[in-house]
Amino acid sequence: MATGQKLMRAVRVFEFGGPEVLKLQSDIAVPIPKDHQALIKVHACGVNPVETYIRSGTYSRKPLLPYTPGSDVAGVIEAVGGNASAFKKGDRVFTSSTISGGYAEYALAADHTVYKLPEKLDFKQGAAIGIPYFTAYRALIHSAHVKAGESVLVHGASGGVGLAACQIARAYGLKVLGTAGTEEGQKIVLQNGAHEVFNHREVNYIDKIKKYVGEKGIDVIIEMLANVNLNKDLSLLSHGGQVIVVGSRGTIEINPRDTMAKESSIIGVTVFSSTKEEFQQYAAALQAGMEIGWLKPVIGSQYPLEKVAEAHENIIHGSGATGKMILLL
């Protein structure tokens, strides 16, 4: 390490495993931005379920060890490399990706994954935009090609991606239904775009949804837990309806005939497959939503960096999401 190089606190993962492999260190060198890169002083970082899958080693993409998790940071520009002319020191920004990892006091990001954060949103809200809103937008607009007047059911609607999907769907003129497992979660879902909400902890909640939508069924289902819900989803769809799989924590057996009768589709989505150009399209639409006011992230549990392992435990095994989980720095 170069003499006099600035140090920072950062969470490091040296082996794949449970939350206990998240190690907070205080002697990590602050990255230096190269061409087309920006260094951000992190004020808040979003915690996403996918980060727990990556940490456990069960996700399709595995980072080289050791690494620092986290892609969704919000803070201020500390420094820029060459040709990063869109930003200057002190600019308020948020990211959709990082190079060095977001669970840290400073994060390095490619300049095309950094966006100006409007004054009307605070840093916690800025850290809640990245994966949730870009994923929800990709699922609804890019993959499902939703149209105004169609119906959408958002499973797990009280979490980060779910609330983002509700807000986007409502803004685009859809009939929005959501599910949540707590009274508080249901209330938040209704406050953020849903026309109706159902308690997925009730044994007969699928019957209630069927009664609500009638014979036509649901045009699009945004599915956060496909290994639990996929069979039920297929029974809820309209003719030509689509299940957009955003999340799954295991396997499930389905009867392909259930897709044949209604000529329905099951489509998987990951925001990591987005091209640079697609990210720019999504960002433009989402930044318009910030200005208009329909994009307003809801913040849930908040943790200091020292409690990152607890955050990872709770995002998977907690009793029910009520907004976006955030690390505060």
Swiss-Prot record:
Q: What does this protein do?
A: Does not have alcohol dehydrogenase activity. Binds NADP and acts through a one-electron transfer process. Orthoquinones, such as 1,2-naphthoquinone or 9,10-phenanthrenequinone, are the best substrates (in vitro). May act in the detoxification of xenobiotics. Interacts with (AU)-rich elements (ARE) in the 3'-UTR of target mRNA species and enhances their stability. NADPH binding interferes with mRNA binding.
PTM N6-acetyllysine: at which residues? 23
**UniProt keywords, alphabetically:** Acetylation, Cytoplasm, NADP, Oxidoreductase, Phosphoprotein, RNA-binding
Q: Where in the cell is it found?
A: Cytoplasm
* EC number(s) reported in the record: 1.6.5.5
Q: Which residues does NADP(+) bind?
A: 53, 158-161, 181, 200, 229, 246-249, 269-271
- Identify residues that carry Phosphoserine: 248
Among the GO biological process terms of this entry, one is:
xenobiotic catabolic process
Its taxonomic placement starts with: Eukaryota, Metazoa, Chordata, Craniata, Vertebrata
UniProt keyword Ion transport present: no
Q: Name one GO cellular component term.
A: cytosol
Name of the protein in its database record: Quinone oxidoreductase
Does ATP-binding show up as a keyword for this record? no
The UniProt GO MF terms for this protein read:
mRNA 3'-UTR binding; NADPH binding; NADPH:quinone reductase activity; zinc ion binding
Q: Which organism is it from?
A: Pongo abelii
Family per UniProt?
A: Belongs to the zinc-containing alcohol dehydrogenase family. Quinone oxidoreductase subfamily.
